[in-house]
């Protein structure tokens, strides 16, 4: 509205340009001084005067709570929209909780926790797998099939030690298949059987005063090297020529 009134009430006049020479010769164009005449009064009010008289209308506050339902129903029929309830106030509504509401919420939370963690709610002990605890085999446990941590010392029973001694008496070295059979029969792990046989072989060598295989291999290598060196020295002495006598 402001833009249109500005265009109407402005004193700006669009300039007009003289036509071609042929129109000037015919006398259709007036004197050029007529183009710069004072603009005529168009009869419209200027900027200081309002275009329309201002009315005494006062805008009243709109109550959102008193919206008629009929208008919403008519609008919904035309545009397939469902009317929605309008809140009475823009602020949050604080309602007093009924008696036992907190208890109901707490029981609901407990039921959800019991569904997520059934073992904790029912008081059952958590499942502990064999690899989660240190095992010291003091009794024969047929149900145990797990391993043993590296730094734990195994206490063998008399029955286990006797069976291992019998096996060592016949075979000081075990194959993989036989080691698996012994471990399964005695409720031990393969590593336990392997370590027991290693310790038992070292003890047997000490009892029979047998040298260690590693020490014996190193000593044999050193003796062979020294023998080769002595042989080279002897061959060098044989190749040295004898000096000629001065008298001859």
From Swiss-Prot:
- For region Disordered, the annotated ranges are 23-107, 207-248
Which residues lie in Basic and acidic residues bias regions? Answer: 35-51
Keyword tags: Developmental protein, DNA-binding, Homeobox, Nucleus, Transcription, Transcription regulation
One GO biological process this protein is involved in is: embryonic skeletal system morphogenesis
Origin: domain of life: Eukaryota
Which InterPro entries does the annotation name?
Answer: Antp_homeobox_Deformed_sf, HD, HD_metazoa, Homeobox_antennapedia, Homeobox_Antennapedia_CS, Homeobox_CS, Homeodomain-like_sf
- Report whether Transcription shows up as a keyword of the record: yes
List, alphabetically, the GO terms of the cellular component aspect: nucleoplasm
Low complexity: bias regions: 217-238
One Pfam entry name:
Homeodomain
Its principal location? nucleus
Motif Antp-type hexapeptide per UniProt: ranges? 128-133
The record's subcellular locations are: Nucleus
DNA-binding positions are 149-208
Which GO terms of the molecular function aspect are on file?
Answer: DNA-binding transcription factor activity, RNA polymerase II-specific; RNA polymerase II cis-regulatory region sequence-specific DNA binding
Task performed by this protein: Sequence-specific transcription factor which is part of a developmental regulatory system that provides cells with specific positional identities on the anterior-posterior axis.
As for family, the record states: Belongs to the Antp homeobox family. Deformed subfamily.
What is the protein name given in its UniProt record?
A: Homeobox protein Hox-A4
**Encoding gene (name):** hoxa4
């Amino acid at each position: 509205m402001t833009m249109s009134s500005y265009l109407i009430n402005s004193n700006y006049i669009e300039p007009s340009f003289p036509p071609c020479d042929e129109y000037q010769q015919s006398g259709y164009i007036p004197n050029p001084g007529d183009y710069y005449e004072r603009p005529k009064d168009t009869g419209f009010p200027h900027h200081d005067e309002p275009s329309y008289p201002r009315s005494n209308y006062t805008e009243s506050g709109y109550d959102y709570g008193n919206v008629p339902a009929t208008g919403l129903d008519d609008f919904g029929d035309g545009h397939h929209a469902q009317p929605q309830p309008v809140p009475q106030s823009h602020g949050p509504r604080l309602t007093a909780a009924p008696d036992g509401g907190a208890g109901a919420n707490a029981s609901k939370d407990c039921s959800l926790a019991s569904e997520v963690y059934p073992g904790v709610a029912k008081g059952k002990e958590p499942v502990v797998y064999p690899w989660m605890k240190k095992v010291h085999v003091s009794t024969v446990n047929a149900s145990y099939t797990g391993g043993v941590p590296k730094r734990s010392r195994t206490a063998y029973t008399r029955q286990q030690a006797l069976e291992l001694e019998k096996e060592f008496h016949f075979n000081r070295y075990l194959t993989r298949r036989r080691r698996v059979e012994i471990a399964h029969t005695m409720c031990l792990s393969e590593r336990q059987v392997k370590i027991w046989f290693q310790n038992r072989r070292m003890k047997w060598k000490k009892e029979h005063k047998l040298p260690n295989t590693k020490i014996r291999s190193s000593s044999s290598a050193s003796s062979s090297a020294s023998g080769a060196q002595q042989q080279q020295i002897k061959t060098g002495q044989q190749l040295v020529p004898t000096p000629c006598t001065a008298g001859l």
